Every structure is written in structure tokens, then in C-alpha cells.
Amino acid sequence: MIFLASRDRYTQRTLLRDVHDRLRKQAGCEDVRYRPSHRRPRYVVADVDPPVFLGDSSDAETARLEIRFWYPVNVDHEYYRLNWVEPDRNFVLGFHRDADHQALGPCHIQLDHEDTATDRYSATFLDEHPLAVLDDRLQQLPTALESVRWTDGTPSLPTCPI
């Protein structure tokens, strides 16, 4: 069992259960599930109805959220990845707090698309409880998605929106 530091015996399993429950209540989120399984959860996935989730029209017909929180050894805080995935366009936009890309600071926003170069920018660091981070990032996601520019079917993130 993994306990998250400074989180009053908050386990990774408990955290993912709370993320799952939070997404089940989120407008536009459907078929919320654990991956790889309920017995061994590592992240939470939800299919998304983009216009309902974003509150306006969206070019995406389908999307999903992939959310992972974990607590690595020898680190005194949680890592996370909150990714918006549009499989039909091979597009991923996510907020990450992990050991990758240290030059960008503790958090970054990342855009991935097929074989194009990945866009990354430093993002606002949130030193909060993981569920507060989840809520804040979910609120920031529509603004981040609006900042993406599409040219001839290729997305770019010209500046950091958050």
C-alpha cells in the first residue's frame, strides 16, 4: 500500500477512487473506469461528450480524459498527468507534474499530435490537495483547448494559456 505524504494516510487507491467518483459527477463524462482494472487501478479514464464537457461547440466528435496520480519513491509530493485525448485526430493535450522536462519547472502543459514535434510550456504550479488540483485543472482545460491553433490539420500551442 502506498501512502501519500502530508495527505493523512491518503492512499493512491483511495485517491483514484475519489477521482473516479468526481468524474462520474462531471457533466459530459461517461463510462468512467479504471485502467488497467478496478482491482489494480493505475489511472482513471472517462469518455467525454466534448460539447457538454466544454460548454460550447467543439470540433472534436469524441474525446476522453485520462487521469493518473502517483507517488514515486524519494519524492515528497504527488505526480500527475491529466490528459485530454482526441483519438480521431491523434491529439493529446495534458497537464503534467512529473520528473520529465525539469527545465520547465514542476508543472507543464504538453501538446502531442502524431509525428509532429511536441509543444511544451511551463504551467502554473498548484501546491494543493490532489482533488483540488484535479478541480483546478479541469476548470483550466477549456481555456487550454481554446488556445490550440489548427493549421492544415496540425495543432500547435503558440503560448502557454495557463
Regions found by a protein language model. Give the residues of each.
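Negatively charged, low-complexity tracts enriched in Asp/Glu with abundant Ser/Thr
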Residues: 1-68, 73-77, 158-161
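Acidic, Ser/Thr/Gly/Pro-rich low-complexity intrinsically disordered regions
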Residues: 1-10, 18, 57-66, 95-102, ...
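Hydrophobic transmembrane alpha-helix bundles
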Residues: 69-82, 133-139
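Well-ordered alpha/beta subsegment
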Residues: 117-154
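An exposed acidic His-Trp-rich patch
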Residues: 78-131
